[in-house]
């Protein structure tokens, strides 16, 4: 499987770095199989940080091996379990089992607005899930432990 990570720097050896913000799937190194999504993120982060160059980092992972040898939490669609997991991580309240790898839909800016309406009580769970079904969602694979990072291999990078 080919994976991408958009950044303002080259990331040959991914590291787990604690962020000062809460993300969809919690702490980890975020990748996607969607090249365009990673390119878009690289450009956004470069513009926001005003340093570096928009960089598409390219990786490979033998998913059959990694998914077998690591603890994997997989969401095949943005369902109730996915919504609960993302909402708890975004609020910094997730207390469940820790996993090596987490795979599922990404809450981009548009989706995040919908989730925020849910977290603030404007939308209930049913309304939120119905709204998400009409959105085009991309995927993300998060490497959440040092163990999981051992399966990720840097293949190269492109300036975008």
Residue ranges and their predicted role:
Residues 1-29, 37, 43-47, 81-83:
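Glycine-rich loop/turn
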């Amino acid at each position: 499987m080919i994976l991408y990570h958009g950044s303002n720097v080259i990331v040959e050896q991914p590291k787990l770095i604690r962020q000062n913000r809460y993300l969809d799937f919690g702490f980890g190194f975020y990748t996607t199989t969607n090249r365009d999504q990673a390119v878009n993120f690289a450009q956004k982060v470069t513009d926001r940080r005003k340093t570096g160059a928009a960089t598409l980092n390219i990786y490979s992972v033998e998913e059959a091996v990694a998914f077998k040898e690591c603890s994997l939490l997989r969401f095949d669609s943005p369902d109730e379990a996915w919504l609960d997991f993302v909402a708890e991580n975004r609020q910094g309240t997730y207390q469940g089992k820790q996993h090596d790898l987490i795979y599922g839909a990404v809450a981009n800016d548009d989706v995040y607005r919908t989730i925020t309406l849910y977290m603030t009580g404007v939308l209930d769970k049913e309304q939120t899930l119905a709204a998400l079904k009409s959105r085009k969602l991309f995927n993300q694979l998060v490497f959440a432990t040092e163990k999981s990072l051992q399966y990720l291999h840097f293949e190269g990078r492109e300036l975008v």
